[in-house]
Each structure stands twice: as structure tokens, then as C-alpha cells.
């Protein structure tokens, strides 16, 4: 073995062992998206059902959501966003842009309904939507088809569906932030260690 070659071989072997232990992530699969989407209703139910209103009936200031608003927003998105836009991509491609999404469209959805009713409604509509999504039996070529978002321009169906899952996670984070704010004064100096009390990320 030439001088330096042994060291190079050891470096290559070390790199290969690291890659084997920490493989590069594979492309996000539709099955991964569905796996998360089908768990969100149960997660919300476990966290929120029968909690005292002191946790759920306040917001973060003018123009922001309560926990009840967030659940209503998720229901509204099931009806108006993900599958309607997926169908439009499959039927029209980029020739017919998506309808604009009303961030406050959930107000009517929530009217007169307690949080447990909204949790039940979200569980039901999510199950219906996932059944339809599975029934589409989407193929790789279909996932690469593009539609036109009113502000973002061309977006792929695969991107829309991955965003559906990330949107769930965004609002789970938002719910934790809204709820944690109720403890802001009570935690005293421990607030320095609590990232959730410092976050002001977008949640709508």
C-alpha cells in the first residue's frame, strides 16, 4: 500500500460506517404523509378533550387563534384545501389556479360548537379525506403534476400533500405555544429555558 493510502482507506472506511449508521433520508413517500395525517386527530383528542377552558379559550393577541380556532381551521382546510386542490391538479393541471384560501373561513365552522364537537368533526372528516386519498391510488407521474397556487405559482401535487402533513405539525406547535402562554407569568425565571414561550412563529 502506498504511503498515505492506508490512512485514506481508514478514512473511507470510517465515512462508510457513518453513512451506514446514519443513512441519508429517502425521498418523502406518500405513505409517510398518510402515517402522520391519520394520527393527528387522536393526538389532538388526547391533548385537548375535557381540558379546563383556561387552557383552550384564549389567544395570543388581536388577530390570533384560540385552540378552538385552530381545530376549526384544520376542519375548514380538510373541506377547502388539500383534496379540492389535489383534484384540481389532477383534472386541470396549471390551467385552472387554486381558489384563494380564507384564513378565517373556520369562523362559521366553529359557530355554536364546543371544542369536543370540533374534535369529533375533525376526526370524522380526516378519516373521510384519507379514505379518498388512498382511493386515488396516485402514481409517481401523477405526484409530479403541477397546479397553480394563487401566490406561489406552480406547485407539484407531491409538494401539496407533503405540506398537508407539515401543516398539521405547524398547528400542533401553535397549540402548544397558545397553551404554554397561560403559564408565562407562573413559571418565573424558568421561562429562560422554555423555547415555547419565546417562539412567535407563524401558525395560521
How does the language model describe each region?
Residues 46-49, 53, 87, 91, ...:
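Charged/polar positions within long, soluble alpha-helices
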Residues 57-101, 144-204:
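Short, contiguous alpha-helical
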Residues 27-55, 77-88:
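Alpha-helical bundle segments that constitute or directly flank the non-heme di-iron/ferroxidase center
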Residues 30-37, 41-43, 47-49, 105-113, ...:
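Small-residue-biased structural context
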Amino acid at each position: 500500500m502506498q504511503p498515505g493510502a492506508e490512512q485514506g482507506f481508514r478514512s473511507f472506511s470510517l465515512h462508510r460506517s457513518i453513512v451506514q449508521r446514519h443513512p441519508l433520508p429517502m425521498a418523502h413517500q406518500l405513505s409517510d404523509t398518510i402515517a402522520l395525517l391519520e394520527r393527528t386527530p387522536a393526538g389532538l383528542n388526547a391533548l385537548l378533550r375535557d381540558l379546563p377552558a383556561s387552557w383552550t379559550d384564549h389567544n395570543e393577541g388581536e388577530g390570533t387563534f384560540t385552540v378552538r380556532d385552530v381545530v376549526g381551521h384544520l376542519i375548514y382546510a380538510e373541506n377547502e384545501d388539500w383534496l379540492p386542490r389535489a383534484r384540481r391538479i389532477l383534472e386541470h393541471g396549471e390551467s385552472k389556479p387554486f381558489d384563494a384560501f380564507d384564513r378565517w373561513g373556520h369562523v362559521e365552522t366553529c359557530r355554536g360548537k364546543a371544542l369536543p364537537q370540533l374534535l369529533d368533526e375533525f376526526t370524522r372528516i380526516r378519516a373521510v379525506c384519507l379514505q379518498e386519498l388512498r382511493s386515488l391510488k396516485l402514481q409517481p407521474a401523477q405526484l409530479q403534476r403541477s397546479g397553480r397556487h394563487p401566490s406561489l405559482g406552480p406547485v407539484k401535487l407531491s409538494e401539496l400533500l407533503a405540506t398537508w402533513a407539515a401543516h398539521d405539525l405547524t398547528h400542533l406547535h401553535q397549540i402548544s405555544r397558545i397553551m404554554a402562554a397561560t403559564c408565562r407569568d407562573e413559571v418565573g425565571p424558568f421561562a429562560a429555558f422554555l423555547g415555547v414561550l419565546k417562539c412567535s412563529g407563524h401558525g395560521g
